[in-house]
């Protein structure tokens, strides 16, 4: 009798699953770019309104994302032009998956700068696309000549550009991204998962550039648990994407919460501004620490390079702080760690541990 595994694709069996760390109670979770606080905390009236709307949500019915009012709320909050259509996904991960499926003709290629979000490469492999990874410069800036040469040579059906980039936090220039879009015949997805922390966006151009899709998520602005992503682009492309997205792919409670949040976006924006201020404070303090390379960030995290990534990761973990160890994920990420910007107290705890390791004479580094 054949093993059940013999019916499973060999290439999938060779893959590794995305690992989500188990976080013991009481740990500061600074590994996944989540908000350190509930987005409605401190706003009692808004909390009461939220609870009332959740209680009234028709959870006995399948959701209708297109009729929920969320698309209109997104359009209003983020200045998405009327000429653009909007597709909603169960997190931007789902949109990455189905945009890849949309373009995965036999022999088609996907292009991305590296290191970047690991799910680009993962989905290319899942759908049989040739993957072209173009290394960044050593300071994590975009190697534009190399990217343009790869576009010319491989003619990718799909290109992903994270703006700002994850896991580095560095933001490529707008002119560089415009050059890639102009040089590409295929679809270019500008992934603005961290766009709220950047201050610039391609959303106003969505719908007017035929091969541009702009993708965002509510996860990084305080709503990671909702799993809502959205993609804006020309109706010709978004209409094709809508054909393959699963029906009822979002739930009533998430739709209700997201719509309410966008109707009170001033509160959410104030939370974002607080995190941006903490990011700048943390960046300045890290810059004072010797033997540390701190990369400029336009996201809600900071990436650093240290003499020994394992030592710092383990020391932080011993002190009940979890960060993301990037060392080993890509050659350019040697001895790098990514630290989510947390609360002031959490950030101070991280800074104090790093100072203890790198601002005192030691014999073991």
From Swiss-Prot:
A GO MF label: histidinol-phosphate transaminase activity
Keyword Amino-acid biosynthesis in annotation: yes
Gene Ontology biological-process annotations: L-histidine biosynthetic process
Entry-linked InterPro entries: Aminotransferase_I/II_large, HisP_aminotrans, PyrdxlP-dep_Trfase, PyrdxlP-dep_Trfase_major, PyrdxlP-dep_Trfase_small
UniProt modified residues of type N6-(pyridoxal phosphate)lysine: 220
Record EC number: 2.6.1.9
Pathway: Amino-acid biosynthesis; L-histidine biosynthesis; L-histidine from 5-phospho-alpha-D-ribose 1-diphosphate: step 7/9
Family, similarity comment: Belongs to the class-II pyridoxal-phosphate-dependent aminotransferase family. Histidinol-phosphate aminotransferase subfamily.
Subunit note: Homodimer.
Name by which UniProt lists this protein: Histidinol-phosphate aminotransferase
This protein's encoding gene: hisC
